[in-house]
């Protein structure tokens, strides 16, 4: 229990930030859904959910991660630091200026996960996914190293989710108002970016697992189980969508090419007869 209690003591100072992040995220959802058209269902989900998610992914997480790392001139060592270390400096205040952007990122990510929990309370997979994420985020307030790696790795995964939101909005199952080319390009974007996001996220965790103060610890085992379970779920969804789509797409292209070849052969024969 000592380790668990110590972790709780490290998380406690962040309680206000986590509550603020959650309240602001829920408020963002509330404002976004005020327009009746924003509550229109797309692939079974209200349109505003996609809009809010994509705003967080592109305009909150990515810029926050960039800003946090850029403060250290993109030094890879930043990814290995804990809450009390910074470029070899020890006894850094976790609630101080040096860790401000990292804290804000995690508060925003926590609120982002909280905001839809009630809305999707009956969706077991969604609820379980977000619950695992919430426990993982909380754990990172107590972890001895690798804060930056989580900030960047989490952003990489969220950018993969960004392409998933795009494909749900304008992909193969979208309405007739979306041009066929747009649908296909959306499917191509998702089919490329989601597995790339999963690959980078997986490689980053393997690197993370070897950090000093983390290698061989329960942190790696526990967080690794959750991390790779989430990646496996994401990849399952990706393959379930992209493999049938592109199998059908290329089959149609081959059939069209065959039909064109046969038509050309018939035309050539007719030309010879004349």
Over which residues does each language-model region extend?
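Membrane-helix and juxtamembrane interface regions of eukaryotic multi-pass membrane proteins
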Residues: 1-157, 170-274
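Functional transmembrane alpha-helices
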Residues: 155-156, 160-165
């Amino acid at each position: 229990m000592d380790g668990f209690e110590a972790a709780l003591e490290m998380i406690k100072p962040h309680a206000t930030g986590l509550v603020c992040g959650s309240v602001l995220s829920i408020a963002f959802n509330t404002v976004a859904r005020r327009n009746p058209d924003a509550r229109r269902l797309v692939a079974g989900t209200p349109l505003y959910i996609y809009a809010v998610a994509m705003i967080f992914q592109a305009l909150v997480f990515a810029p926050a991660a960039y800003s946090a790392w850029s403060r250290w001139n993109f030094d890879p060592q930043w990814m290995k630091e804990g809450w009390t270390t910074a470029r070899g400096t020890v006894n850094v205040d976790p609630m101080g200026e040096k860790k401000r952007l990292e804290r804000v990122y995690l508060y925003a990510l926590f609120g982002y996960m909280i905001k839809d929990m009630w809305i999707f309370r009956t969706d077991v997979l969604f609820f379980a996914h977000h619950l695992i994420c919430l426990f993982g985020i909380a754990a990172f307030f107590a972890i001895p190293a690798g804060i930056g790696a989580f900030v960047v790795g989490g952003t990489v995964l969220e950018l993969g989710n960004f392409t998933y939101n795009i494909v749900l909005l304008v992909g193969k199952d979208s309405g007739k108002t979306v041009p066929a080319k747009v649908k296909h390009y959306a499917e191509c974007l998702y089919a490329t970016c989601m597995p790339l996001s999963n690959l980078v996220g997986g490689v980053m965790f393997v690197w993370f697992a070897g950090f000093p103060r983390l290698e061989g610890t329960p942190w790696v085992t526990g967080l690794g189980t959750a991390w790779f379970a989430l990646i496996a779920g994401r990849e399952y969804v990706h393959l379930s969508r992209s493999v049938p789509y592109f199998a059908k797409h290329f089959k149609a292209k081959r059939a069209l090419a065959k039909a064109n070849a046969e038509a050309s052969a018939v035309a050539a024969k007719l030309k010879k007869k004349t």
